[in-house]
């Protein structure tokens, strides 16, 4: 065997981990909105209808979850990051007597769409979490997975807003979020700025709950920051 070929191959393998994080992960591009806008949870609205998102229908371990197609779209302004979830479902599992004016802790015990966003690529275990339910309930948390036990600070408040609606005839629900960027990122928003992110859903009634994610975590815990993809601010 040619020794130079062996050395060259070894160098290539050693350099692979030095590739940028975004080259090895899924990417969602958040498109630049002309201005901030009111939430409608309507994918046909002017601010959303031309936006290309990402689609997933896979479980935590990458297996297909039929009849639960999930599309995530994103746009941004210098002040806010917007997310829109389009969620196909078979059945709804909703909290009785929902509150849309106060935070609902443990909202994940019912149907939700979730966004986990981290901005420190040197501290991937610190990130923030945002949830919206089909009822329009919400909860946001500051997460730090470094301590034992991990810190899930539900008292942290981003000031984000949500809007949701259910199309029962077509078995699709829609959830929108408007998140103040300055609350989770110290950097100035600009085209090309990247964040670490993953998106999730919990849907249906136990014991038949469905767990859908954009980037599969390959275990039973959504709090797996190593699996996050990239959210990139686009034009």
Where on the chain are the PLM-derived regions?
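Structural preference for beta-rich elements and adjacent junctions enriched in aromatics
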Residues: 23-235
